[in-house]
């Protein structure tokens, strides 16, 4: 993958949505919810503030995260789907 995010942007590999419900019902492709979890694969240098100082990113490559439902822009690279989003769209790190 050759995506290098700029500023406070982060590249996330989308984790697949569940194929079955908890009760075992197999979901058709159209019924699946858009996933909101992913793995950070690349991080920009951070946000530059008006005074010129820089805020370092709070996540790093390899972190599993939860992000806002409609966050980011989808891109496809080498057959893999990724999201590019701002750090503010990440809600939590899964530990």
Swiss-Prot record:
<dbReference type="InterPro" id="IPR011032">
    <property type="entry name" value="GroES-like_sf"/>
</dbReference>
<comment type="subunit">
    <text>Heptamer of 7 subunits arranged in a ring. Interacts with the chaperonin GroEL.</text>
</comment>
<feature type="region of interest" description="Disordered">
    <location>
        <begin position="36"/>
        <end position="55"/>
    </location>
</feature>
<dbReference type="GO" id="GO:0051087">
    <property type="term" value="F:protein-folding chaperone binding"/>
</dbReference>
<keyword id="KW-0143">Chaperone</keyword>
<dbReference type="GO" id="GO:0051082">
    <property type="term" value="F:unfolded protein binding"/>
</dbReference>
<dbReference type="GO" id="GO:0044183">
    <property type="term" value="F:protein folding chaperone"/>
</dbReference>
<dbReference type="GO" id="GO:0005737">
    <property type="term" value="C:cytoplasm"/>
</dbReference>
<dbReference type="InterPro" id="IPR020818">
    <property type="entry name" value="Chaperonin_GroES"/>
</dbReference>
<comment type="similarity">
    <text>Belongs to the GroES chaperonin family.</text>
</comment>
<dbReference type="GO" id="GO:0046872">
    <property type="term" value="F:metal ion binding"/>
</dbReference>
<comment type="function">
    <text>Together with the chaperonin GroEL, plays an essential role in assisting protein folding. The GroEL-GroES system forms a nano-cage that allows encapsulation of the non-native substrate proteins and provides a physical environment optimized to promote and accelerate protein folding. GroES binds to the apical surface of the GroEL ring, thereby capping the opening of the GroEL channel.</text>
</comment>
<dbReference type="GO" id="GO:0005524">
    <property type="term" value="F:ATP binding"/>
</dbReference>
<dbReference type="Pfam" id="PF00166">
    <property type="entry name" value="Cpn10"/>
</dbReference>
<dbReference type="InterPro" id="IPR037124">
    <property type="entry name" value="Chaperonin_GroES_sf"/>
</dbReference>
<protein>
    <recommendedName>
        <fullName>Co-chaperonin GroES</fullName>
    </recommendedName>
</protein>
<dbReference type="InterPro" id="IPR018369">
    <property type="entry name" value="Chaprnonin_Cpn10_CS"/>
</dbReference>
<keyword id="KW-0963">Cytoplasm</keyword>
<dbReference type="GO" id="GO:0051085">
    <property type="term" value="P:chaperone cofactor-dependent protein refolding"/>
</dbReference>
